[in-house]
Amino acid sequence: MVQIGIRGSLATADMWQFSYKSGMRVISIEEFHDKGWRWAAEEARKITGDGSAYLSFDIDSLDPAYAPGTGTPEPGGLTTLEAQRLIRDLGGLDFVGADLVEVSPPFDTGGITTMTAATILFELLCVLAQARVQRKPLSRG
């Protein structure tokens, strides 16, 4: 498992001990911005290898300027373009599913978050479709 874009004023290494002890790769927002979305995608690819993958996208990984309608807005997140490019660069992995979580319509100023969520869902559907086309047909034996 890879967690990308972890941040927050209280996000210290101690807070992520469960993730580390469970073998998860945590890529902080600082590391993401220092090394870039291509590097983060490559890290995820290394960990996933040829295995099946599931992509869960938490809308609050985005900066609240792009997605204010979430329960835990935290400045300093990804831009919409960074998220799109990251997801696109993960194309070719054997995705078996995906989801988008943490959209909170009552907090959504002017429909910004729902429009952004729809854009991210479109990107997720594209990589899911690509994975399905690339997957070998199931044997009916």
What are the functions of these language-model segments?
Residues 1-7:
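Short internal beta-strands
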Residues 10, 16-141:
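Catalytic cores of soluble, metal-dependent hydrolases
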